[in-house]
Amino acid sequence: MNAEKSPENHNVDHEEIAKFEAVASRWWDLEGEFKPLHRINPLRLGYIAERAGGLFGKKVLDVGCGGGILAESMAREGATVTGLDMGFEPLQVAKLHALESGIQVDYVQETVEEHAAKHAGQYDVVTCMEMLEHVPDPQSVVRACAQLVKPGGDVFFSTLNRNGKSWLMAVVGAEYILRMVPKGTHDVKKFIKPAELLGWVDQTSLKERHITGLHYNPITNTFKLGPGVDVNYMLHTQNK
């Protein structure tokens, strides 16, 4: 099954889906195209768990879960995890890897808007990592995430800022020079300024709690969280 056979929805970019379908079989290859995701996952997981006050016993939704790197790690923390994605092949990889790892994650091929229509207010934590820049209407995703979380629950977003530096680092550097990710992975026009994301958040029931940058040092080949949101950044919000 390919991206064109996925359920129809206005907020799906089939070209974006096809990119990830093509490399889905290598999602769990620690030295493959998704090596950066494996490298930053401990940072993402640590940030989410700390800001949410732990994940054990919580009901968590991972929006745009892909092959399940973050979803599995949150399940290992004791969360009950549902992973959403519109890519059939990435979900098949995620399901197989979870089975092989003995990890329980419920993977669903569905848009977040469709899921919100049926499961509003059911999750303690919602995560949406590196997904907003891959859909036609990211504001619609933000609205749906707000609808899905319980009162007092936590919603986390991560994406890329839109400016010259992020183009140099995430496109020229990561795709063409360092070849950390496949060429064509990113479109700088789809990157999202923090002010834009915060503006969408302000139009929902969510409230900003914390924002941090995710930084890569090519000399030491390491990632870290810290001040500065000029390239990659993560946002923690909470439902009012």
Swiss-Prot record:
The keyword S-adenosyl-L-methionine applies. GO terms for molecular function: 2-polyprenyl-6-hydroxyphenol methylase activity; 3-demethylubiquinol 3-O-methyltransferase activity; polyprenyldihydroxybenzoate methyltransferase activity. InterPro entries: SAM-dependent_MTases_sf, UbiG_MeTrfase. Keywords: Methyltransferase, S-adenosyl-L-methionine, Transferase, Ubiquinone biosynthesis. Pfam families: Methyltransf_23. Pathway: Cofactor biosynthesis; ubiquinone biosynthesis. It catalyses: a 3-demethylubiquinol + S-adenosyl-L-methionine = a ubiquinol + S-adenosyl-L-homocysteine + H(+); a 3-(all-trans-polyprenyl)benzene-1,2-diol + S-adenosyl-L-methionine = a 2-methoxy-6-(all-trans-polyprenyl)phenol + S-adenosyl-L-homocysteine + H(+). One of its GO terms (biological process) is methylation. Its EC number is 2.1.1.222, 2.1.1.64. Belongs to the methyltransferase superfamily. UbiG/COQ3 family. O-methyltransferase that catalyzes the 2 O-methylation steps in the ubiquinone biosynthetic pathway. This is Ubiquinone biosynthesis O-methyltransferase. It comes from Escherichia coli (strain ATCC 8739 / DSM 1576 / NBRC 3972 / NCIMB 8545 / WDCM 00012 / Crooks). The gene is ubiG.
